[in-house]
């Protein structure tokens, strides 16, 4: 996938393409990490790359539950959403995120009108009391916003772990040739 979204022909394709791009850059922050690095929280916050990916997978699924008006996870699940459980690995949360992305795209493909009302769940303190419904369009824009926000967090966490930044990670993941201005990321040599 390129570093920017290619031209698109319509709104639905644009929204899904921008969401896919943000998911991609979030997943890139995990490229080459070990499971222990993926759960490391090397900054002042408790955020980890693996935890951010899991949170976005759970959050995106929850928003699609809201769109479809089906029950969503509990607050306990939300609270644990930033942490990998004892049976979870980086590979398992990346797989979960891929499955959630495919579910989202299938759900959105099945909705005729992006203006379709999405009832605002009641009793959530950070949701507005004076808004009764969002639209599917609004939900997709919000997912793009949230994914971009957390991809930025993950960039900082990743750079703190081993100095890796977005474009060298992308170059390594996509096998770009080295140039005088861009060197693909390489795992640091392990001292023996």
Protein language model regions, located:
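Proline-centered turn/helix-capping motifs that create local helix->coil transitions or kinks
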Residues: 72, 108-117
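Short, contiguous alpha-helical
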Residues: 2-5, 12-31, 35-81, 121-192
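Solvent-exposed, charged/polar functional surfaces in cytosolic regulatory/catalytic domains
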Residues: 25-28, 32, 99, 103-110
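Helix-adjacent hinge/juxtasegments
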Residues: 73-107
């Amino acid at each position: 996938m390129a570093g920017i979204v290619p031209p698109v022909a319509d709104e639905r394709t644009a929204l899904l393409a921008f969401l896919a791009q943000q998911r991609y850059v979030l997943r890139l922050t995990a490229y080459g990490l070990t499971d222990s690095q993926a759960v490391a929280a090397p900054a002042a916050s408790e955020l980890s790359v693996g935890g951010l990916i899991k949170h976005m997978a759970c959050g995106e699924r929850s928003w699609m539950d809201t769109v479809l008006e089906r029950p969503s996870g509990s607050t306990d699940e939300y609270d644990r959403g930033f942490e990998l459980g004892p049976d979870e690995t980086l590979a398992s949360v990346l797989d979960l995120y891929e499955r959630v992305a495919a579910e989202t795209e299938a759900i959105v493909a099945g909705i005729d009108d992006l203006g379709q009302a999405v009832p605002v769940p009641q009793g959530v303190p950070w949701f507005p009391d004076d808004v009764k419904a969002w639209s599917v369009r609004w939900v997709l824009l919000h997912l793009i916003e949230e994914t971009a926000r957390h991809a930025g967090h993950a960039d900082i966490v990743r750079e703190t772990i081993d100095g890796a930044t977005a474009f060298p990670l992308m170059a390594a993941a996509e096998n770009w040739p080295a140039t005088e201005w861009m060197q693909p990321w390489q795992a640091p040599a392990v001292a023996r």
